[in-house]
């Protein structure tokens, strides 16, 4: 294992990103640089009761910040969670947000930061990522934001969007604004060492899904391609290590970086994995990373006729023998087996009762637009049923 101190550094892309073990100690200074004196730390209820959150709040207080805590967030955050967070922000007279946690906490916190100072009457759903909806919001009213991920998967800490569940319609909506991206990001591997192996695996596969779908998306974006393929190499090298040895700080740090790389790369686009994972998460309240991990080989198989060339290049970069889509799928299957990822959706309690509805929801999901093949609702239904039954 190499000297972990060599990973202590900073860069801008475009957020100011601080990496290294113990960098959470820099949080108060980063808040002050953004003009915060009374930040609201937003996280999920599971993390809120852990010592790490109290330690962060106490450290902020010792540095002169009046930091509050909001943790009323579901595993798949809802519009009601965001509204409650906005109320807490206003009632506590806060002036910034610390987004702390996994994808749920980060997404909810970013949405709160977006909405906290907007004009009265502006609906969160009016900012769904459709056309120029983002122009409905006042970008200058978005409050300062520092993101601190405690899982390595969603990459939401460097993203310009939040995925929020519309409970009334039972659908996940992507809320977007170009100024939602956090100004500061702290990637501290010590915050992730307590993750159980199953969560490490599921979130790590989520990072892989972002890189992989960005790699396969047909749009012209060479920078995203380069970031995506290097992100996948880091997943290959470091996810099994982080899974097997949770205290491996080098592996944990590199998975945090791979996660951020995935979310940076997918500005090129996502695809059918996410087009299916979003409705499945909304309908079954299932873990997003686990859904993408299970769906991955089935979507690659369905896209096979359109992704031959990028799969050959990917295999060569990852040193996979006999480059091609079949070999890439085999690599995914082998990785999933090492991480004890289930082979089918049925194994996590998802039945086929809503197959038609899932197909109809997937085909209109924003992620479907950048899939290499323009699947129909019936195509999505078939992919879902294959994944539900384990037919590859």
Regions found by a protein language model. Name each.
Residues 80-189:
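Glycine/threonine-rich beta-strand-loop-alpha-helix active-site module
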Residues 158-268, 378:
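Carboxylate- and glycine-rich phosphate/diphosphate-binding segment that chelates Mg2+/Mn2+
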């Amino acid at each position: 294992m190499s000297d972990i101190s060599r990973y202590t550094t900073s860069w801008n892309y475009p957020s100011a990103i601080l990496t290294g073990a113990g960098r959470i100690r820099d949080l108060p200074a980063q808040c002050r640089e953004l003009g915060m004196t009374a930040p609201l730390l937003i996280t999920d209820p599971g993390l809120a009761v852990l010592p790490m959150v109290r330690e962060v709040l106490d450290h902020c207080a010792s540095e002169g910040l009046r930091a509050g805590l909001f943790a009323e967030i579901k595993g798949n955050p809802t519009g009601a969670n965001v509204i409650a967070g906005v109320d807490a922000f206003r009632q506590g007279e806060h002036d910034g947000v610390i987004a702390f946690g996994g994808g749920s906490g980060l997404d909810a916190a970013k949405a709160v930061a977006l909405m906290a100072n907007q004009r009265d009457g502006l609906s969160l759903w009016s900012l769904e990522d459709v056309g120029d909806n983002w122009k409905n919001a006042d970008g200058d009213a978005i409050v300062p934001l520092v993101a601190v991920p405690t899982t390595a998967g969603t990459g939401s800490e460097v993203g310009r969007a939040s995925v929020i569940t519309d409970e009334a319609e039972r659908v996940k909506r992507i809320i977007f604004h170009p100024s939602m991206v956090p100004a500061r990001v702290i990637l501290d591997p010590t915050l992730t060492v307590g993750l159980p192996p199953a969560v490490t695996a599921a979130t790590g596969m989520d990072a892989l899904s972002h890189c992989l779908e960005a790699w396969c998306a047909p749009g012209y974006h060479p920078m995203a391609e380069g970031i995506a393929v290097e992100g996948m190499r880091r997943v290959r090298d470091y996810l099994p290590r982080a899974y097997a040895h949770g205290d491996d700080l080098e592996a944990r740090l590199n998975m945090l970086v791979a996660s951020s790389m995935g979310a940076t790369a997918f500005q090129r686009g996502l695809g059918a994995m996410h087009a299916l994972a979003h409705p499945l998460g909304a309908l079954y309240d299932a873990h997003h990373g686990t859904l993408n991990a299970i769906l991955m080989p089935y979507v690659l198989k369905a896209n096979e006729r359109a992704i031959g060339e990028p799969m050959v290049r990917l295999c060569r970069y990852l040193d996979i023998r006999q480059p091609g889509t079949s070999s890439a799928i085999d690599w995914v299957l082998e990785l999933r087996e090492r991480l004890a990822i289930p082979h089918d959706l049925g194994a996590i309690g998802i039945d086929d009762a809503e197959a038609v509805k899932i197909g109809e929801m997937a085909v209109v999901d924003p992620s479907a637009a950048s899939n290499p093949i323009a699947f129909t609702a019936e195509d999505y239904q078939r992919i879902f049923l294959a994944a539900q039954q384990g037919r590859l």
